[in-house]
Amino acid sequence: MAGYGDLKAKGDLDQFFSQVDRPRGIHLCGNPDWDFLLNLDLDVLSLDVYTNAEIFASYATAIRKFLERDGVIVWGIVPTGFETFQKEDMHSMIERLENVWRVLWGKGVDKERMIARSLISPATCCLVNPDRERTVERAFVTVSRMSNVLKTKYL
């Protein structure tokens, strides 16, 4: 919006978050200015990394600083749209997530800190599918299974 710059947006968000008890978090399905968001006074950042992985990974410095402030990243890696979900399996989604992680580790993000400060989730909040809620329910089951696989591998 014309006339609504970063400083005004940051001030408005800071004012809003000052009225919210911690932990303070935000979820975004889109592709915002990640540097701007990662530098807000947030505790939790939830994002659609399934769609935005490459762009998000280019903000390694801001991600590292966010994690050093004990921020939590919720990696939305399981699509909830019917057609997209049908194209994937758990192993392809794990590989997709680990590819992003490897890029970040290669750019200086501490592996142990990142793993300790990470959660996984569905990528989006899609509730309109040809099969109604079935794909979303299957996505949550997949998240649980992926979580167990990743815990075994990394913890």
Could you say what each language-model-derived stretch is?
Residues M1-Y59:
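Active-site loop segments of alpha/beta catalytic cores
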